[in-house]
């Protein structure tokens, strides 16, 4: 079987040795090859059946007609709003589409940390501060004391109460942590809870028997601490639990003295509403009202000074 090249089929010519070989460009000059190829293409088009072209056009036309009919049906279905029920159905369908589109992100719960190695005291105290319950549980499960403390005698319970880590507070108390353990400034867990401002921890301590009247080295009660740090809910709960409104610290100040000095309006109103004494004098002989007047006079003196300086500057500017 002989193999012919395209050029031989188109022109009907062969090379000099009469067999299918390398194409000789010298045999076709002045565009003879291009003309032969163009002629062959025209002959191919002539050989195509005439009805095949017509069939392709008819198919395209029929597809266009079908698309137009489908669009028309959709528009007719949309326009058929005979009553309110049809409108409600459409609204519900749109809502369902929206719900399908919005994917609710699945939040994976962190795997529980498994502690196998022994936990030392510094790591245990740090875990209580940073809310790392598995570390605390491992330390306690190894029969260690929950009342170990740092150089300032602050225990894990003090730290957890400050940060409001309720689960750790519960775990420490289950292990026998002392609620009335005092740090270097003689603050107890209830002082630290009010300093941190966590109401749930404060409630837990009181329910477990924490002394509401406990005082630190400055003779401050938990109510003093709550007022100074501005934790309104803690102060309100302490008052509801019958904390002493007029308890004096080492300087003779009551919680109301502290509230006035720090200009905590909500605390002042809270204490006065529940009957705090306005006439109690501190060690300097000042009542809460005296502090208000002193603050007003001090503020008035500052404004008078500023006003006088502004007047002097204006006089200098005129000369």
Swiss-Prot record:
GO terms for cellular component: cytoplasm; cytosol; fibrillar center; I band; myofibril; nucleoplasm; nucleus; perinuclear region of cytoplasm. Signal peptide: none annotated. ANK repeats lie at residues 152-181, 185-214, 218-247, 251-280, 284-315. InterPro entries: Ankyrin_rpt, Ankyrin_rpt-contain_sf. The keyword Nucleus applies. GO terms for molecular function: actin binding; DNA binding; histone deacetylase binding; p53 binding; R-SMAD binding; RNA polymerase II-specific DNA-binding transcription factor binding; titin binding; transcription coactivator activity. It is found in: Nucleus. Residues 55-89 form a coiled coil. Expressed in heart, cardiac muscle. Induction: Down-regulated by doxorubicin (adriamycin), in vitro. The keyword Repeat applies. Keywords: ANK repeat, Coiled coil, Nucleus, Repeat. One of its GO terms (biological process) is positive regulation of DNA damage response, signal transduction by p53 class mediator. May play an important role in endothelial cell activation. May act as a nuclear transcription factor that negatively regulates the expression of cardiac genes. Interacts with TTN/titin. Interacts with YBX1. This is Ankyrin repeat domain-containing protein 1. It comes from Rattus norvegicus. The gene is Ankrd1.
């Amino acid at each position: 079987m002989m193999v012919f090249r395209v050029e031989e089929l188109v022109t009907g010519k062969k090379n000099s040795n009469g067999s299918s070989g390398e194409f000789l460009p010298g045999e076709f000059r002045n565009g003879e090859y291009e003309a032969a190829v163009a002629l062959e293409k025209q002959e191919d088009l002539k050989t195509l059946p005439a009805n095949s072209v017509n069939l392709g056009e008819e198919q395209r036309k029929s597809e266009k007609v079908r698309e137009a009919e489908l669009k028309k049906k959709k528009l007719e279905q949309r326009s058929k709003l005979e009553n309110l029920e049809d409108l409600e159905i459409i609204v519900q369908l749109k809502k369902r589409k929206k719900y399908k589109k919005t994917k609710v992100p699945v939040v994976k719960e962190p795997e529980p940390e498994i502690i196998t190695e022994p936990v030392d005291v510094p790591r245990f105290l740090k875990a209580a501060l940073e809310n790392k319950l598995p570390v605390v549980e491992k330390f306690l499960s190894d029969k260690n004391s929950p009342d170990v403390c740092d150089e300032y005698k602050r225990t894990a319970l003090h730290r957890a109460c400050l940060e409001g880590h309720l689960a750790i507070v519960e775990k420490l108390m289950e292990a026998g942590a002392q609620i009335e353990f005092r740090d270097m400034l003689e603050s107890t867990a209830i002082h630290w809870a009010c300093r941190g401002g966590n109401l749930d921890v404060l409630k837990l301590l009181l329910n477990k028997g924490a002394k509401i009247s406990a005082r630190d080295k400055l003779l401050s009660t938990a109510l003093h601490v709550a007022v100074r740090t501005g934790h309104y809910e803690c102060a309100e709960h302490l008052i509801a639990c019958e904390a002493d409104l007029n308890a004096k610290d080492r300087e003779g100040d009551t919680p109301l003295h502290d509230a006035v000095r720090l200009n905590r309006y909500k605390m002042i109103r809270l204490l006065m509403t529940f009957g705090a004494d306005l006439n109690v004098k501190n060690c300097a002989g000042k009542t809460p009202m005296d502090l208000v007047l002193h603050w007003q006079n001090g503020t008035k003196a500052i404004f008078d000074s500023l006003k006088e300086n502004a007047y002097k500057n204006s006089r200098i500017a005129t000369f």
